[in-house]
Swiss-Prot record:
InterPro entries: Asp/Glu-ADT_sf_sub_c (IPR036113), GatC (IPR003837). The lineage of its organism: Bacteria, Bacillati, Bacillota, Bacilli, Bacillales. It comes from Bacillus pumilus (strain SAFR-032). One of its GO terms (molecular function) is glutaminyl-tRNA synthase (glutamine-hydrolyzing) activity. This is Aspartyl/glutamyl-tRNA(Asn/Gln) amidotransferase subunit C. Heterotrimer of A, B and C subunits. The gene is gatC. Pfam families: GatC. SUPFAM superfamilies: Glu-tRNAGln amidotransferase C subunit.
Length: 96
């Protein structure tokens, strides 16, 4: 018995705005059915004495210290702007 129908594959393709042929829909149905079948096999694995993990490596994120740096002066920013007025950068309007 198939775990996913061809109609479901077509529906997902439609939601993803993908145009697929009938042959592609059949092929994807078979492939997805195989993937789902494999994933279902994972439910059969005995994980009784396995400690839950959130990361497979025993490595923490190594980050630099979050130290604020002095930013650019208003003059330095304004000199790079194509259009400015009274210390503000002017941009084209996007709303009517």
């Amino acid at each position: 018995m198939s775990r996913i129908s061809i109609e479901e594959v077509k529906h997902v393709a439609h939601l993803a705005r993908l145009a697929i042929t009938e042959e592609e829909a059949e092929m994807f149905t078979e492939q997805l059915d195989s993937i789902i079948s494999f994933a279902e096999q994972l439910n059969e694995v005995d994980t009784e004495n396995v400690e839950p993990t959130t990361h497979v490596l025993k490595m923490k994120n190594v980050m630099r210290e979050d130290v604020p740096n002095k930013g650019l002066s208003i003059e330095a920013v304004i000199k790079n702007a194509p259009d400015h007025k009274d210390g503000y950068i002017r941009v084209p309007s996007i709303l009517d």
